[in-house]
Amino acid sequence: KTAISPQIIHFSTHGYFIRQYQEENKKICDCGFDVKSTYFDSPNCGLILSGVNNNISYNTSSNSADDGILSAKEIMQLNLNNTELIVLSACNTGLGDIHSTEGVYGLGRAFKIAGVNKIIMTLWQVPDYQTMELITLFYNNLLIRKLCPRKALHEAQKTMRLKKYEPYYWAGFIIVE
């Protein structure tokens, strides 16, 4: 898996996170796929992309570079030093294993190691329609109003609040700088 380092990267997909104590052979994520935990690389989180059904439907591992899974381990090996912002419009992308003295090991850390400056991610499962609305507001604030990413997200969340959406629909999005 190779990537260039554009200024902004946006993923609108499914994220997964496997807790360390998760038993093998159980459903490992709330992304709709029932696969064995041994299939995934460590660290135990990533993004599910197109092509994943080709491997998961047979419940086998693939050594192919295009297996449909972008794991945190693979992300850490990318050079994204020129990427200012990555938006992870996917469930649970802000989760990870907590290490007492080192913080959270998850997608946020993986993208930081790869060189990304700012990361927008989620702390829980986010509903599709409201996520689309929030992200549309965010990009309007970022690209048209020329707000910085932190302010653009804050203003988008404020608009969702003014539209009387419950916090569940918008508060799960955070930015890590």
Please report, for each region that a protein language model flagged, where it lies by residue.
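Catalytic cores of enzymes
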Residues: K1-E177
